[in-house]
């Protein structure tokens, strides 16, 4: 359906932006797209030279047919990211993307970290609407208060570092979430903390910049 194509393209735009801004090279890499849905991120990885992509989603029958038929893609349906382990994959995963809804990244980061090989990289979409708590949402499901965005990013950075992931870079997603929420993309590395470049990040300034960039 046309709406599926649109959804896939929107997803692809987000990871495409991350590849550009973060200077990612996926050439020849084995990747996992967690929360694959229609496959926007999977498609993007292939376009950026990925050798193989595991398209993982808790749902069924969502992945675009062209990707289902692609020998470089394994469609892993009905898989809950919370319970993923490295054993699930028959090859070491060098790059993970995460575009998850209705669940906090705090609940899946341990599993994702376990699945990523040493030195591997991860790009996660931070969605404040699934992190901030119900009290932070307005009637339309939007997290309007900048303070809540600052809190979400601060807490997640602590959570990622506690799992031994170095937070390298963060950027604003070029498109809002389907519900109209501002979202962020973060690059994490399964490496020692010398790779952590966000220790000096002024999160409040970064959030203000994000809000200002979407002012009409």
List PLM regions with ranges:
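Short, small-residue-biased leader/transition segments that mark boundaries at the very start
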Residues: 1-6
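Flexible, glycine-/basic-rich loop-and-beta segments that form/coincide
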Residues: 182-216
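Conserved SAM-binding loop of SAM-dependent methyltransferases across substrates and taxa
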Residues: 38-49
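Glycine-rich helix-loop-beta junction characteristic of Rossmann-like nucleotide cofactor-binding loops
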Residues: 20-27, 89-90
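S-adenosyl-L-methionine
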Residues: 54-103, 107
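Short, glycine-/aromatic-enriched active-site segment of Class I SAM-dependent methyltransferases
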Residues: 128-144
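A short glycine-rich, Lys/Arg-flanked "PGG" loop and its adjoining helix->strand segment in the class I
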Residues: 106-121
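Conserved class I S-adenosyl-L-methionine
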Residues: 27-37
């Amino acid at each position: 359906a046309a709406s599926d194509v649109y959804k896939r393209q929107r997803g692809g735009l987000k990871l495409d932006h991350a590849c550009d801004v973060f200077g990612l090279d996926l050439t020849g890499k084995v990747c996992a797209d967690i929360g694959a849905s229609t496959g926007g991120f999977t498609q993007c990885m292939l376009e950026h030279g990925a050798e193989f992509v595991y398209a993982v989603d808790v749902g069924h029958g969502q992945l675009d047919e062209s990707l289902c038929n692609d020998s470089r893609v394994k469609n892993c349906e009905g898989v809950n990211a919370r319970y993923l382990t490295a054993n699930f994959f028959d090859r070491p995963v060098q790059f993970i993307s995460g575009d998850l809804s209705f669940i906090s990244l705090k609940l899946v980061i341990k599993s994702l970290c376990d699945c990523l090989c040493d030195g591997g990289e991860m790009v996660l979409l931070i969605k404040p609407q699934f992190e901030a708590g119900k009290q932070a949402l307005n009637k339309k499901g939007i997290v309007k208060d900048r303070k809540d965005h600052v809190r979400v990013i601060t807490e997640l950075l602590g959570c990622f570092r506690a799992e031994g992931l170095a937070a390298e870079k963060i950027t604003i997603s070029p498109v809002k979430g389907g519900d109209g929420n501002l979202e962020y993309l973060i690059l994490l590395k399964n490496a020692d903390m010398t790779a952590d470049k966000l220790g000096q990040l002024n999160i409040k300034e970064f959030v203000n910049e994000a809000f200002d960039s979407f002012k009409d």
